[in-house]
């Protein structure tokens, strides 16, 4: 990523702030503009109140793409004026220099496909980086369609955040929690058999600490 010969598209979770910060730094080191979507920008904006070191920073290299569905949601919840706070960072398809490789994108597959088509038409072949659990790629054919469009292959660069049972047991034994709430799992019902003080909750339930 040190050269600017090709734009780089990264497939990753928009809510993974650590990954976004890593991309922000990589873009700065390589002299690129980092393009994220509206959801990621608002998330960074809200978290910056708690952690001022997070991007964005004044006069930096961060740009914001407004996907229609996200734009409509923001306007519906907060009004059209909310979008003005990011006006100086706004970028859309008409503002992208498709003859340049100076970009690092973290956007949805739909936006990725549209932008990749623009680069290909300009004779610029994008690079693709996949940074999520591989199961998503196997289940969603949008990833293979992007490969077909660009003639590029997704480069797998990812450290999984998933933990195995023996690792979770070591953590629970070390922490000895008064209450253990299973989250982000397909096997919440099994926790009672392996852990003490488990407390199952459903989506929308309130937990009073």
Could you tell me what each predicted segment is?
Residues 1-209:
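Acidic/His-rich, metal-assisted hydrolase cores and their charged scaffolds
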